[in-house]
C-alpha cells in the first residue's frame, strides 16, 4: 500500500466519523428554579449623636479655676490673680468667670 492510499483511507474514515457526529441531537435539560431564597440580614445600629459637657468654676482667694469635662477628655484651666488688689481682685475674678463662661457658650 502506498502512502497516498493510506492517507486517503484515513481521511475517509474521519469524514465518516464527523458526518455521524453531526447527526446527534442535543437536548437542553437546564431547569430554572421557581423559588429563590435570600440569606441577607440587616442589623440596625444607633449611637448618641452628641457629647455631654460639664462646666464647673471655683473662685478661691487668689485664683479662678475652670474645669471642663466631656465624654472624651477633661480640661482644667487655672488663672492666678495678683495679690494685694483687695476688692478689685474679687470683681476681676467674677468678670473673668463670666468671660470664660461666655466664651465657652459661643
Curated annotation (Swiss-Prot):
Prodomain positions: 85-106
GO cellular component: extracellular region; side of membrane
Glycosylation sites per record: 67, 72
Post-translational modifications reported in the UniProt record: The GPI-anchor is attached to the protein in the endoplasmic reticulum and serves to target the protein to the cell surface. There, the glucosamine-inositol phospholipid moiety is cleaved off and the GPI-modified mannoprotein is covalently attached via its lipidless GPI glycan remnant to the 1,6-beta-glucan of the outer cell wall layer.
Signal peptide: 1-19
Keywords assigned: Cell wall, Glycoprotein, GPI-anchor, Lipoprotein, Membrane, Secreted, Signal
Keyword Membrane: yes
Name of the featured protein: Protein TOS6
Topological type in the membrane: Lipid-anchor; GPI-anchor
Principal location listed in the UniProt entry: secreted
Coiled coil spans: none
Compartments, as annotated in UniProt: Secreted, Cell wall; Membrane
Lipidated residues (GPI-anchor amidated glycine): 84
Family the UniProt entry places it in: Belongs to the TOS6 family.
